[in-house]
Amino acid sequence: MTDIFSAIQRTAIRIKDAIDTKDIGYSQQENSSGETQLQLDIKCDMIIEEEFSHVTSIHTIASEEKEREVILHKDGRYFIAYDPLDGSSLIDVNLSVGSIFGIYEGAFGAKNMVASCYVVFGPRVEMVFAHNKTKLHLLQGKEFEFVKEIRLNEKGKLNAPGGTQQNWKPYHKKMVDSFFNEGYRLRYSGGMVPDLHQILLKGGGLFSYPSTSDKPDGKLRKLFEVFPFAFIFNRAGGEAIDGAVDLMNLEYAHIHDTSPCFFGSKYEIQRVREVYASNQ
């Protein structure tokens, strides 16, 4: 696991340099979702694959930018699914973006996840790595230094509601509004990594990306985004569900499979359970 952690640190340093200097214009290529890729998406994907290719413990990688997984080392034991640059469309307005890594042992799947990591590229570069605990690291020069363990409070203060509001179900909108009526503050940038990072570092709250009329199975991908953050929130004392079921109990049909998802402190997630149970 140490070799993987070190490789992720190297990718973070190289991606930071790419963000600072790389052309962010559109390429002529499309990713697995049919979206035109930015030059920076392609560059970051190449950086990660290159660094992981040197780690013999990694058997297979799957990138959010590619249709199929890639076998690196047949004798490896770890399978890594990653989003090279989540929120890359925010680069041109200079908002924070991030990389997400789900580390699985033996095969992909939530029940095989053994560690998870994400990197935030903002005014500072920070890395959160979850194995037995959820730990924050800060890039200082060319080295990451441990800062602290992250623990969520029982109840938070932030509300980050995703998805187009006109496509929300009425009871979901009512629930979101109820948190604001309790004094919760809106924190939503359109980037999953910085929004969830803020909830983790500020002690708690709720991030939601529900089933909507245009995306009934949710938008966020299980292997690349949903499972990794569910693992992190669970290790930090929070919870993560699809509206009813613990996200870490979900299966996946293919590597780009999606799910509705809710991440937060115990208080907020219990509210989600109650609201969704009474509206099924």
From Swiss-Prot:
The cofactors it requires, by name, are:
Mg(2+)
Tell me the superkingdom of the source. Answer: Bacteria
Q: Which UniProt keywords apply?
A: Carbohydrate metabolism, Cytoplasm, Hydrolase, Magnesium, Metal-binding
Residues bound to substrate: D86, G87, S88, S89, Y188, K219
Localization, UniProt: Cytoplasm
Gene Ontology cellular component annotations, sorted alphabetically: cytosol
Pathway as given in its UniProt record: Carbohydrate biosynthesis; gluconeogenesis
Q: Mind listing the GO biological process terms from this record?
A: fructose 1,6-bisphosphate metabolic process; fructose 6-phosphate metabolic process; fructose metabolic process; gluconeogenesis; sucrose biosynthetic process
- The enzyme's main class, written as a single word, is hydrolase
Signal peptide (UniProt feature, chain positions): none
Record-annotated residues binding Mg(2+) 1? E64, D83, L85
The EC number of this protein is 3.1.3.11
Q: Tell me any Pfam family this protein matches.
A: FBPase
Listed InterPro entries:
FBPase_C_dom, FBPase_class-1, FBPase_N, FBPtase, SBPase
Q: How many cofactor units bind, and how?
A: Binds 2 magnesium ions per subunit.
Q: Which reaction does it catalyse?
A: beta-D-fructose 1,6-bisphosphate + H2O = beta-D-fructose 6-phosphate + phosphate
- The UniProt annotation places Mg(2+) 2 binding at D83, D86, E225
> Which GO-annotated molecular functions does the record name?
fructose 1,6-bisphosphate 1-phosphatase activity; magnesium ion binding
Q: Indicate the quaternary assembly.
A: Homotetramer.
Task: List, alphabetically, the NCBIfam families matched.
Answer: PRK09293.2-5
PANTHER family in the record? FRUCTOSE-1,6-BISPHOSPHATASE-RELATED, SEDOHEPTULOSE-1,7-BISPHOSPHATASE, CHLOROPLASTIC
Q: Which family does it belong to?
A: Belongs to the FBPase class 1 family.
Report the protein name in the record.
Fructose-1,6-bisphosphatase class 1
Q: Which gene encodes it?
A: fbp
